[in-house]
Curated annotation (Swiss-Prot):
SUPFAM superfamilies per the UniProt record, alphabetical: alpha/beta knot (SSF75217)
Protein's UniProt name: Ribosomal RNA large subunit methyltransferase H
Broad enzyme group: transferase
The entry's keywords: Cytoplasm, Methyltransferase, rRNA processing, S-adenosyl-L-methionine, Transferase
Annotated S-adenosyl-L-methionine binding sites: L72, G103, L122, S123, A124, L125, T126, L127
The species this protein was found in: Enterobacter sp. (strain 638)
Reaction catalysis annotation: pseudouridine(1915) in 23S rRNA + S-adenosyl-L-methionine = N(3)-methylpseudouridine(1915) in 23S rRNA + S-adenosyl-L-homocysteine + H(+)
Cellular component, GO annotation: cytoplasm
EC number(s) recorded for this UniProt protein: 2.1.1.177
Source species taxonomy: Bacteria, Pseudomonadati, Pseudomonadota, Gammaproteobacteria, Enterobacterales
Length: 155
């Protein structure tokens, strides 16, 4: 199984790249994890936000292909770390690759939400999307460590 993080936005600050890359390099070779960045639509005073969301969503879904789609969204399920580890195990048993979708400033398109098999809420708080990349990578690495009895996670 391959994990794929599909996120709106490019040219992240150095701290985001450093944090994300740190966890990315820790993943084992039998569970590759990749980042696909989708360019954010141009937003301005008179921007058509629905059109922008739809275009971003179209690009995200194209990147995900036939993968299992999991959206990151405030109304999603708030998995704790052991629950995320269980989900990771289920995904592995399913055999398909998994694409986790992070929307842009206005969130995800309705098409992305409709295509999702699951929705995961990191928090009831609104989080900056660059930070979410790092949190997702760390959370998935921690979940993997639980499933393999790696000493990274301590109860």
């Amino acid at each position: 199984m391959k994990l794929q993080l599909v996120a709106v936005g490019t040219k992240m600050p150095d701290w985001v790249q450093t944090g994300f890359t740190e966890y990315l390099r820790r993943f084992p070779k039998d569970m590759p994890f990749e980042l696909v960045e989708i360019p954010a639509g141009k937003r301005g005073k008179n921007a058509d936000i629905k059109r922008i969301l739809d275009k971003e969503g179209e690009l995200m879904l194209a990147a995900a292909g036939k993968n299992r789609i999991v959206t990151l969204d405030i109304p999603g399920k708030p998995w704790d770390t052991p629950q995320l580890a269980q989900e990771l195990e289920r995904w592995k048993l399913d055999g398909r690759d998994v694409s986790l979708l992070i929307g842009g400033p206005e969130g995800l398109s309705s098409a992305c939400k409709a295509a999702a098999e699951q929705s995961w809420s990191l928090s009831a708080l609104t989080l900056p999307h660059p930070l979410v990349r790092v949190l997702v990578a760390e959370s998935l690495y921690r979940a993997w460590s639980i499933t393999t009895n790696h000493p990274y996670h301590r109860e």
